[in-house]
Amino acid sequence: MKQKVIFVLLNDYSDWEGAFLSTALHVGVVPGSDVKYEVYTAAPTLNEVRSIGGLRTLPDYSFENIPRDYAALVLIGGNSWDSPEAEFVSPLVQEALSKGKIIGAICNASSFLCSHGFLNEVKHTGNGLDQLKQWGGESYTNEAGFIEKQAVSDKNIVTANGVGYLEFTREMLLLLQANSPEVIAGWYDFFKNGYFK
C-alpha cells in the first residue's frame, strides 16, 4: 500500500520548490520504477491557494482534516511563513515529530521551523544563518548546528535554502527510501547537469 506524503502550502508558496519532489514521488524516481508514495496537498482551508508564480492549487486537506496515516510532511517555502495562518502548522509539525514522521522544509519554511525551536536538536540549513537568527530570536539555540549547504538531512528533518530544491529533493528521496541510493544519485546528476555537461 502506498504511503501519503503531504505538501503543506500557504498562499504565495514557491511553486518550483516542491515540483521535483512531488513528481519523483508521484510517478517514480525514474520512469517505470516502483511508486511507493501518493502526493497530497494541505492548506489552511479547503479554499485554493495561489503560488508566487500564479498557479492555483485546490488542496486535498485543510489543516483541520489532515489524516494521521502519512509518511512525511513537506513544508514548501514562500512569502507567508511569518503570517498568522502559518502558526497553525506548528502543532502539525510537533505531532509529526513526536510520531517519528519525516519533516521536509525548504526556504522560509526552514526559517519557520527555526522560529519554533524545531531545529535546536538537528543539523540544518536554510536561507542563511543571519535569516535563521532573525526569525528564530531567542527560540533558536543551535547556531552551531547550521551548515552552509544547499540541503541538510539529520534525524527525520530535511532543510534547504530556496534554491536548493534539487538537493532538497535528493535528501527527501533518500530519507523516504523512494528508490536505491544509486538510482537517486543518478536522478540528481541528470537534473543537475542535464543531457550535456
Task: Locate each region found by the language model.
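Active-site-adjacent pocket-lining segments in enzyme domains
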Residues: 2-8, 13-14, 20, 27-45, ...
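Short gly/ser/thr-rich secondary-structure transition/capping motifs
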Residues: 52-60
